[in-house]
């Protein structure tokens, strides 16, 4: 079933949904925290929120995908590419909510790739936000401008807790995606993408920052704490980049068993099944590893021809002390 929860009975209507992709659960946990704290009414000065806001929440839009930990639903459809044709029941439910509720603000909650970062600073993109566009020209409509201003208000607070880890998500127009489609229907929409933080594989920092973001947005709406922000302030937020991070970065490996010895770096990622894969070979100084190790003095025992991008990292090295070491052992050190 798709569960829909309503809180409050105020004039400002907010629609929030999470886990449109079944394997993206960070915001679902954050929504449970948010509901709990909002009902307690002790941590935040929101005693009159019930008369100011009507908050509609769908905590798990893609229950079938969540059960299987897959991005797609039970039909193998990516719900977030179904906004135009509405062939998925989940997509139809979401569109019905948008059409019937006509929210003042829609929050589209996702997880982002673990390797996204802020390239010029080589920091993880723990929270990335976006005011989606409604067309290829990326016109700044009144509802998009409001989303931009609200994002500015939220990121100002977030930077007090996770400086250098707040980013602006890519705004390429995607007409099949719900965020862009909902903006085109005249609804102010914010995409919130939860990412990683150093030594936080389960994204608990992003979970906490989501909750803080939700309350900050409510506070900004309640007390008009966003209207002074400009479009320039929004675009000053650093844009996140792909492939800034890898799981393991190995540097200074000398390839000596050749007519012309050379030194390389190797980057490796681990997929959700635990398999290790080679990403890059060569100069990798622009990429940062969640774990970084120098292999100066090590020797590669594996055939160098096995060392190819997009191949399994079934590599064996000899340490300076003569020990045989595998990639998995390097990951666990």
Q: What function would you assign to each model-found segment?
A:
Residues 1-6:
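A short loop-to-beta-strand scaffold at the N-terminal edge of the catalytic core in hydrolase folds
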Residues 7-9, 321:
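Feature targets compositionally biased, intrinsically disordered low-complexity regions
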Residues 8, 61, 193:
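Residues at the C-termini of beta-strands that transition into short coil/loop
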Residues 11-15, 20, 25-164:
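Active-site/substrate-binding loop(s) of hydrolase catalytic cores
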Residues 129-333:
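C-terminal accessory segments enriched in acidic
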């Amino acid at each position: 079933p798709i569960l829909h929860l309503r809180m409050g009975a105020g004039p400002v209507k907010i629609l929030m949904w999470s886990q449109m992709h079944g394997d993206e659960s960070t915001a679902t946990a954050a929504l449970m925290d948010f509901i709990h704290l909002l009902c307690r009414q002790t941590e935040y000065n929101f005693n009159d929120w019930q008369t100011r806001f009507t908050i509609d929440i769908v905590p798990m839009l893609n229950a079938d995908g969540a059960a299987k930990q897959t991005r797609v639903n039970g039909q193998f459809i990516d719900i977030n590419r179904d906004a135009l044709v509405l062939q998925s029941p989940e997509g139809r439910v979401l569109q019905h909510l948008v059409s019937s509720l006509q929210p003042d603000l829609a929050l589209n909650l996702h997880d982002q790739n673990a390797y996204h970062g802020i390239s010029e600073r080589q920091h993880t993109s723990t929270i990335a936000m976006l005011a989606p566009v409604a067309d290829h020209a990326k016109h700044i409509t009144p509802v998009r401008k409001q989303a931009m201003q609200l994002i500015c208000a939220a990121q100002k607070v977030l930077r007090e807790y996770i400086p250098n880890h707040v980013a602006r998500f890519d705004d390429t127009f995607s007409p099949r995606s719900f965020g862009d489609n909902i903006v085109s229907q005249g609804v102010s929409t914010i995409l919130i993408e939860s990412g990683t933080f150093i030594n936080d594989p389960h994204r608990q920092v992003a979970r906490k920052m989501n909750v803080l973001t939700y309350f900050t947005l409510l506070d900004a709406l309640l007390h008009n704490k966003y209207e002074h922000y400009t479009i320039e302030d929004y675009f000053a937020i650093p844009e996140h980049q792909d492939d800034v991070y890898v799981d393991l970065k190995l540097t200074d490996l000398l390839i000596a068993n050749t007519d012309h010895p050379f030194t390389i770096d190797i980057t490796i990622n681990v997929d959700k099944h635990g398999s290790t894969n080679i990403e890059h070979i060569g100069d990798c100084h622009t990429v940062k590893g969640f774990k970084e190790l120098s292999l100066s003095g090590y020797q590669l025992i594996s055939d160098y021809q096995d060392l190819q991008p997009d191949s399994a990292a079934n590599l064996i090295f000899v340490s300076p002390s003569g020990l045989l070491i595998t990639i998995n052992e390097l990951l666990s050190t």
